Amino acid sequence: MVQLTEVEDEHFQQPQVGPEEDDEDFTDTDSEISVDSDYESQETFTDRLYALRDMVSPTTRGWFYHKYSTTTNFVKSTLSFAGRAAWAVSVSGLLIGVPFAIAFAEDQNYAAMEQEARMRELGSDVLTAGGEGQAGTAEKTLAAIGGEGARPAL
């Protein structure tokens, strides 16, 4: 059977050339983070956001700005077109619709007056109907109700 043995290189057994390691050179990072001496209470959200600017590369910032400006320009032009179209439609509606509505109302009035005149004409024909040998409307009504003529009440 084969046996494996670990052979260490002499190079790794000697200490490396360089400054001596001293544990006092290193400090606890937790204590540095918790120190509030660097905290500015006057720092605003925009200051913090502006400080993050260096974390994003200039090409990425340019790409985001291009997308932002393209989107805002599209929204502005769309809203501008929609406003102008709404103005044109409403003014056209007022210039055409109001006179049309007035003319339509007048036409309805004329039609109602003509119908009323025809009804009066028919009503007068019915009341005065009858020729020679025919009884008038009053006589027909009196005969229908079976009444005699009017008598004075004493």
Swiss-Prot record:
GO CC aspect terms: mitochondrial outer membrane translocase complex
Record's subcellular location: Mitochondrion outer membrane
Region of interest (Disordered), ranges: 1-31
Cytoplasmic side: 1-84
Transmembrane intervals: 85-105
Subunit structure: Forms part of the preprotein translocase complex of the outer mitochondrial membrane (TOM complex) which consists of at least 8 different proteins (tom5, tom6, tom7, tom20, tom22, tom37, tom40 and tom70). Interacts with tom20 and tom70.
PANTHER family assigned: MITOCHONDRIAL IMPORT RECEPTOR SUBUNIT TOM22, MITOCHONDRIAL IMPORT RECEPTOR SUBUNIT TOM22 HOMOLOG
Family: Belongs to the Tom22 family.
Name of this protein: Mitochondrial import receptor subunit tom22
Species per Swiss-Prot/TrEMBL record: Neurospora crassa (strain ATCC 24698 / 74-OR23-1A / CBS 708.71 / DSM 1257 / FGSC 987)
Organism lineage string: Eukaryota, Fungi, Dikarya, Ascomycota, Pezizomycotina
